[in-house]
Amino acid sequence: MVFYKYSGSGNDFLIVQSFKKKDFSNLAKQVCHRHEGFGADGLVVVLPSKDYDYEWDFYNSDGSKAGMCGNASRCVGLFAYQHAIASKNHVFLAGKREISICIEEPNIIESNLGNYKILDTIPALRCEKFFTNDSVLENIPTFYLIDTGVPHLVGFVKNKEWLNSLNTLELRALRHAFNANINIAFIENKETIFLQTYERGVEDFTLACGTGMAAVFIAARIFYNTPEKAALIPKSSESLELSLKNDEIFYKGAVRYIGMSVLGMSVFENGCF
């Protein structure tokens, strides 16, 4: 079994083709492990589709499945083109979402995430029990729960430096309380937003999260009147351009091919596949 590793906005993914739909949870846990596997934020299984160029199953590094991953969508789009699975402009199925891909330059990929849902606005009072004394999060008056393929809780701080002082235990508590990824952001100007994401399935801060950046972008647009196009800068410092067109979210940014890995028979013998 051959795995291809791609990176987008600081997220890295292993991509593999399969001609049959199976449960790849155990395989994902093993191959995504940073010390005992190849190391990745997630595993993308590319599957044949009757109605689309292809479809995928996406697994987090802990083996859990997710319906959508924004940066992985751009990575798999480039993979599909480079491996003659699809043309430069194509559409694939991610869970129940149709994702359109446009390859504008050799490694600049735009993907259409589709629409979003504002699930709830949450006053800080509902979250105070999760905060420690002198918590940075106490300065956030309102949190926003937004579905961009997966649920995200978004809050904005007034000081960029506070992004470096976030408490992992607090974010973990919020993640379990709302069953959502947690994003804390700072609007530097109307067109530049910095953020940190605590991600489900990874259970820690990640260098980037595409659907998290989308949720922050939407919250900033709706509640802080930012423009319909902005640069989102995650922990990796790899900027991603997000835009809103006809109420749908578009990502645009660079994707890098890292390399190829081959799975040995030992994994099969251990029952991981």
UniProtKB/Swiss-Prot annotation:
Pathway(s) the chain acts in: Amino-acid biosynthesis; L-lysine biosynthesis via DAP pathway; DL-2,6-diaminopimelate from LL-2,6-diaminopimelate: step 1/1
Residues reported to bind substrate: N11, N60, G70, N71, N181, E199, R200, G210, T211
Highest taxon in the source lineage: Bacteria
Cellular component terms (Gene Ontology): cytosol
Compartment(s) of residence: Cytoplasm
Catalysed reaction equations from the record: (2S,6S)-2,6-diaminopimelate = meso-2,6-diaminopimelate
Enzyme class label: isomerase
Annotated Pfam families: DAP_epimerase (PF01678)
Main localization (coarse): cytoplasm
Keywords: Amino-acid biosynthesis, Cytoplasm, Isomerase, Lysine biosynthesis
GO MF annotation terms: diaminopimelate epimerase activity
Site for Could be important to modulate the pK values of the two catalytic cysteine residues, residues: H152, E199
EC number(s) given by UniProt: 5.1.1.7
Record: active site: C69 (proton donor), C209 (proton acceptor)
InterPro entries membership: DAP_epimerase_AS (IPR018510), DAP_epimerase_DapF (IPR001653)
Keyword hit for Isomerase: yes
GO biological process: lysine biosynthetic process via diaminopimelate
Family statement: Belongs to the diaminopimelate epimerase family.
Subunit (UniProt): Homodimer.
Biological role: Catalyzes the stereoinversion of LL-2,6-diaminopimelate (L,L-DAP) to meso-diaminopimelate (meso-DAP), a precursor of L-lysine and an essential component of the bacterial peptidoglycan.
Protein name (Swiss-Prot/TrEMBL): Diaminopimelate epimerase
Native source species: Helicobacter pylori (strain Shi470)
Gene that encodes it: dapF
